Design a protein with these regions (language model features):
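Deubiquitinase catalytic domains
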Residues: 13, 35-41, 52, 168-261
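Eukaryote-specific, cytoplasm-facing alpha-helical/coiled-coil scaffolding segments in long proteins
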Residues: 85-91, 108-112, 219-233
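C-terminal regulatory/interaction module of P-loop NTP-utilizing enzymes
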Residues: 158-171
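Alpha-helical interaction elements in eukaryotic regulators
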Residues: 34, 54-55, 59, 75, ...
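Non-catalytic, low-structured ubiquitin/UBL-interacting segments
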Residues: 1-52, 68-73, 93-159, 258-261
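Interface signal in eukaryotic adaptor modules for cytoskeleton, membrane trafficking
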Residues: 59, 64, 71-105, 166-168
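Short helix-capping/linker segments at secondary-structure and domain boundaries
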Residues: 66-73, 202-208
Length: 261
């Protein structure tokens, strides 16, 4: 999957920094408007951020760009093809089940919200025709309960719609071959399964820093500890990656982070 780039020297390994050296760099750091967010967060001017073509290819592009820095050439197409080859029937069925579940839930929520809105309007009309105070209280209580249920479902529907968005590429996908095909296409955006699987098959480890958390001043969650979503790695119980790749996650985009480039 990787081809050596002739004529491009492989950079030497960086000298390991001691805790004292890292502390000295932080103490000497002076923030500048031109500094990127990682430099500001780490208080270290040696970090760079490399943009890529974006879209659904961004995570694959960070791998391509990272290995290009050590004179190893690959492509997004090759990486997607390699990932597609890891798909099993169980993996396909899991994605299919998730898509079907959220799709059905969205339809159900939409219908229930519509019905509750109708029920509320009927109770409102009924309330306006009632003269008896006690009966008014009963209808008012019913109307409040219906509205509360309606508002609750509206919020749940928003969450369901967001979850369904993550599986939208599964629309019209009915078998494993179709699923493999969509993974080879930019409609599939890398998720936790893709990240864990790419880490295993390429023997790499992503260090994910969240610029979204940094911008929201949620500094405790800048370093994202991704979940392990690969049964083969789980069964091995041990993982010793050959390379570590630092990436910036913006919330919907990945970019490569470099150090002392």
């Amino acid at each position: 999957i990787f081809v050596k780039i002739n004529g491009v020297p492989v950079p030497p390994l960086l000298k390991e920094e001691s805790q004292k050296e890292a502390k000295n760099m932080r103490e000497k750091y002076h923030e500048s408007p031109k500094d990127n967010w990682v430099e500001k967060y780490m208080k270290n001017n040696n970090f760079s951020i490399q943009e890529n073509e974006g879209g659904g290819d961004c995570l694959f592009a960070t791998i391509r760009d990272a290995f290009a820095n050590i004179a190893q050439q690959t492509s997004v197409r090759k990486l997607r093809k390699k990932l597609a080859g890891e798909v099993t029937q169980d993996i396909f069925e899991n994605y299919k089940e998730q898509y079907d579940m959220y799709s059905a839930s969205l339809v159900r929520d939409t219908n229930n919200i519509k019905q509750l809105a109708q029920d509320y309007n009927l109770l409102k009309q009924k309330f306006e025709t009632i003269i008896d105070r006690d009966e008014q209280k009963i209808v008012l209580k019913q109307a409040k309960e219906v509205k509360a249920e309606h508002d609750k479902l509206v919020q749940e529907k928003k969450v369901t719609a967001q979850m369904l968005k993550e599986y939208k590429f599964m629309k019209g996908i009915d078998n494993i071959d179709q699923f493999k095909k969509v993974i080879r296409d930019c409609d599939f955006w890398a998720d936790t399964w893709a990240i864990s699987t790419l880490e295993r098959i390429l023997n790499i480890k992503f260090i994910v820093l969240s610029s979204e958390s940094y911008k929201n001043k949620d500094l405790k969650n800048v370093l994202l500890c991704g979940q392990l979503n690969d049964t083969i790695l789980e069964q091995k119980g041990r993982f010793t990656p050959e390379f570590y790749i630092m990436i910036d996650y913006t919330g919907d985009h990945y970019k490569l982070i470099g150090y002392k480039k």
